[in-house]
From Swiss-Prot:
NCBIfam families: prfA, PRK00591.1
Name of the protein this chain belongs to: Peptide chain release factor 1
PROSITE patterns named among the record's database cross-references: RF_PROK_I (PS00745)
Its biological purpose: Peptide chain release factor 1 directs the termination of translation in response to the peptide chain termination codons UAG and UAA.
Keywords, ordered alphabetically: Cytoplasm, Methylation, Protein biosynthesis
Species: Blochmanniella pennsylvanica (strain BPEN)
N5-methylglutamine modification, residue list: 235
Length: 360
């Protein structure tokens, strides 16, 4: 294992030992706030230290077993044991590297996913509908239940815009890299001359922030409008003004919700989406201040970023951030999205580790 990583682990082990001494003092609980801070740090380091100590034990076992290779009677047994030790050591090293990576506090949360048709007119709306179906299928594979917050239907099918919530632990960690511009290349059904058209859909995935952590919103900053819910083709599906449109005047953000028959439920959902959007904007602003908007291989998540191309003529899908191409387009569109998500996560972890080593 890299000496820089080993030195960092030794430093964390020493810090862990210091924390244990501090937390075991009789008066440690006197300052409850400070005690909680130390306890959280102790809990965070605990798994790393336990894993590192296992690595040190195996390292010593390897040294001891290598000495047995000189013994003719023990040579074969020692070789078999070494194979097992090397395998265990490699697995532990992989875990340690992941444990050392910076954590995203939002990774344990559910998420909102917003899809908007871009350039391409009717075909873009159809493509947006197909992408949403892909996420629905993926949610079914994961046994997640997806809740539609608001939908604006396309003239020939699909959606001009659709917002959904996936209120399941860890959903954000898997879907956050879907944010960005998605491009499709194919011959539309309405194309009589067989020309390939390009259409786009922009996607934003934001964490579902618990109500207690949402930013406080001044009611005076909100403009709330009511209207009748409408379905596909624009027909009204409700005779009462149950749909809600909330405008946050200072930021210009607008959220609509017409999924529920109750105006109060629609308002609550819309406020939840608005709060999460405002939180995401604030978090992004803070990250930009710290990192000076340094772009890594996974992009910034801006909706203008073209992250992926779907080529139906060739059955090919390419993620441009990691130069990854798969010819399993049909499988991915039918919910096997992990074929794309896992390579992106692995590359992201590798990139984070490289940055960690650069900082040492």
């Amino acid at each position: 294992m890299n000496s820089i990583i080993v030195n960092k682990l030794i430093a964390l082990q020493e810090r862990f030992n210091v924390l244990e001494k501090l937390l075991s003092k009789p008066n440690a609980i006197d300052d409850k706030k400070h005690f909680c801070t130390l306890a959280k740090e102790h809990a965070r380091l605990s798994e790393i230290v336990v894993c590192f100590e296992r690595w040190l034990d195996i390292k010593q076992e390897i040294i001891n077993t290598k000495k047995l290779l000189e013994d003719v009677d023990m040579h074969d047994i020692a070789q078999d044991e070494l194979k097992t030790f090397y395998l265990n050591r490699n697995n532990i090293e992989k875990n340690l590297k992941i444990l050392l990576l910076p954590t995203d506090s939002n990774d344990k949360l559910g998420c909102f996913i917003e899809l908007r048709a871009g350039t391409g007119g009717k075909e873009a709306a159809i493509f947006t509908g197909e992408l949403f179906r892909m996420y629905v299928r993926y949610s079914e594979v994961r046994r997640w239940k997806m809740e539609i917050i608001n939908a604006t239907y396309g003239e020939c099918g699909g959606y001009k815009e659709i917002i959904a919530k996936i209120p399941y632990r860890g959903a954000y960690s898997l879907l956050k890299f879907e944010s960005g511009g998605h491009r499709v290349q194919r011959i539309p059904h309405t194309e009589s001359q067989g020309r390939i058209h390009t259409s786009t859909c922009t996607i934003a995935v934001i964490p579902e922030i618990p109500d207690i952590e949402l930013p406080s919103i001044d009611p005076h900053d909100l403009r709330i409008d009511t209207f009748r819910s409408s379905g596909a083709g624009g027909q009204h599906v409700n005779t009462t003004d149950s749909a809600i449109r909330i405008t946050h005047v200072p930021s210009g953000l607008v959220v609509e919700c017409q999924d529920e028959r109750s105006q109060h439920k629609n308002k609550a959902k819309a406020l939840s989406v608005l709060g999460s959007r405002l939180h995401a904007i604030e978090m992004k602003r803070r990250q930009q201040e710290v990192s000076c908007t340094r772009r890594n291989l996974l992009g910034t998540g801006d909706r203008s970023d073209r992250i992926r191309t779907y080529n139906f003529q060739q059955g090919r899908i390419t993620d441009h951030r990691i130069s990854f191409t798969s010819y399993k387009l049909n499988e991915i569109m039918n919910g096997e999205l992990d074929l794309l998500i896992q390579p992106i996560i692995h590359q992201h972890q590798s990139d984070q580790l490289n940055k960690l080593l650069e900082l040492e």
